[in-house]
Curated annotation (Swiss-Prot):
Subunit structure comment from the entry: Homodimer.
Lineage: Bacteria, Pseudomonadati, Pseudomonadota, Gammaproteobacteria, Enterobacterales
CDD domains: NAD_bind_Glutamyl_tRNA_reduct (cd05213)
Pathway(s) per entry: Porphyrin-containing compound metabolism; protoporphyrin-IX biosynthesis; 5-aminolevulinate from L-glutamyl-tRNA(Glu): step 1/2
Record keywords, A-Z: NADP, Oxidoreductase, Porphyrin biosynthesis
Name of this chain's protein: Glutamyl-tRNA reductase
The species this protein was found in: Yersinia pestis
One Pfam family here: GlutR_dimer
UniProt-annotated catalytic positions: C50
UniProt record, GO biological process: protoporphyrinogen IX biosynthetic process from glutamate
Assigned EC number: 1.2.1.70
Protein family (similarity comment): Belongs to the glutamyl-tRNA reductase family.
């Protein structure tokens, strides 16, 4: 048995290919059942996200293993092997172990250190667990990978710094205000970036969120999810004074928030400070706003500078994380190699126990029939010794007959003959 990881990801295949090789949640049971019907496959986990599709398998090693698994993948997705062959990567043994640990820890992600992948790996594991498609080796590997990912998060700073615009905007707000729990936030727009910002802010339990958008309908579903109030863009002027933090990201060709609007809001607020974060290009907030006292304006360029600084910090943390993964993968392989002896030891003990049981039973019968106890015990010891050393003796004789001194020495070591 060997462990194998194969797949495609954002580094080896464009989205046009990745989307053709995905496994939907609805089809996962069917895919796992089909995979386990392959003669060489003893257990499997399928990880399928927007950036990667990977199979983690325990398999019987054979020369045509790659061809068989490529054929299965292509048949399942109705593709030609030529479509995927150049994009597929293969990891065996320790490389497969290390790859999964890197994936779970966010070290192989498009955004270095992103935490979402760990949840996706756990979900894939749970699917295989539910479908009873795990081998004992795979189960141990995934459980170990989860603990490695946790260790990487705990012992390094790989997840501490913002490397997305949305996360950077929220991090900036937390740096300036420390706690967000008593603050009111106005979000302008309802696109993907604002969605991410809203979810980050909800996690930090802001007191109140307002989402301003050109149409209420577009913003309503997001507002329902994060518990926000919805207003239209023309209502911003009247509500701006309510906000301590304003984060804007629309596709408007002209500014939505002007200097005069902010001046009126500051007057109403009696000059309590306001933080403006403008993520939009073109800008949603007039640059002159940043010149007002108690109005602090940051643009998308300011956020990019923060992101670049934070990415450098993550890359430094990744070096430490890679060291953890290397150490833990070696520890796992030590355990895995030891498992190779478990079945042999179990069989050997079972055989010895069977011999002991049979010969003890015969000895007890002899004693019950009146035989001399001392003679029975001596005979039992003699026969038991001969039975137990018979197979090793034959192996020693064969090794000597073959002139195989290396095997002869290995047998001597196994039998403890050179121990003093």
């Amino acid at each position: 048995m060997t462990l194998l990881a194969l797949g495609i990801n954002h580094k080896t295949a464009p989205v046009s290919l990745r989307e053709r090789v995905t496994f939907s949640p609805e089809s996962m049971d069917q895919a796992l059942n089909s995979l386990l019907q392959q003669p060489l496959v003893q257990g499997g986990v399928v990880l399928s996200t927007c950036n990667r599709t990977e199979l983690y398998l325990s398999v019987e090693q054979q020369e045509n293993l790659h061809e068989q698994l490529t054929a299965w993948l292509c048949n399942y997705h109705k593709l030609s092997p030529d479509d995927v062959r150049q994009s597929l990567y293969w990891h065996h043994g320790n490389d497969a172990v290390r790859h999964l640990m890197r994936v779970a820890s966010g070290l192989d992600s498009q955004v270095l250190g992103e935490p979402q992948i760990l949840g996706q790996v756990k979900k894939a594991f749970a699917e295989s667990q539910r479908g009873q498609s795990l081998s004992s080796e795979l189960e141990r590997l995934f459980q170990k990978s989860f603990s490695v990912a946790k260790r990487v998060r705990t012992e390094t700073e790989i997840g501490a710094s913002a490397v997305s615009v949305a996360f950077a905007a929220c991090s900036l707000a937390r740096q300036i205000f420390e706690s967000l729990s008593e603050l009111h936030v106005l979000l302008v727009g309802a696109g993907e970036t604002i969605e991410l910002v809203a979810r980050h802010l909800r996690e930090h339990q802001v007191k109140h969120m307002i989402i301003a958008n050109r149409t209420r309908e577009r913003a309503q579903s997001l507002a329902s999810e994060v518990g926000a109030e919805v207003i239209t863009l023309p209502e911003i002027d009247a509500r701006l004074a309510d906000a301590d933090i304003i984060i804007s990201s629309t596709a408007s060709p002209l500014p939505i928030i002007g200097k005069g609007m902010v001046e009126r809001a500051l007057k109403t607020r009696r000059n309590q400070p306001m933080l403006f974060i403008d993520i939009a290009v073109p800008r949603d907030i007039e640059p002159e706003v940043g010149k007002l006292s108690n109005a602090y304006l940051y643009s998308v360029d300011d956020l990019q500078a923060i992101i670049q600084h934070n990415m450098a910090q993550r890359q430094a943390a990744a070096v430490q994380a890679e060291s953890i993964v290397q150490q833990e993968s070696m520890n796992f392989m030590t355990w895995l190699r030891a498992q190779g002896a478990v079945e042999t030891i179990r069989d050997y003990r079972s055989q010895a126990e069977q011999v002991r049981s049979e010969m003890t039973a015969k000895a007890l019968v002899a004693i019950e029939q009146g035989a001399n106890v001392e003679q029975v015990i001596n005979e039992l010891a003699y026969k038991l010794t001969n039975r137990l050393i018979h197979a090793p003796t034959k192996s020693l004789q064969q090794a000597a007959s073959d002139g195989d001194m290396e095997r002869l020495q290995l047998l001597r070591d196994s039998l403890g003959l050179d121990q003093h």
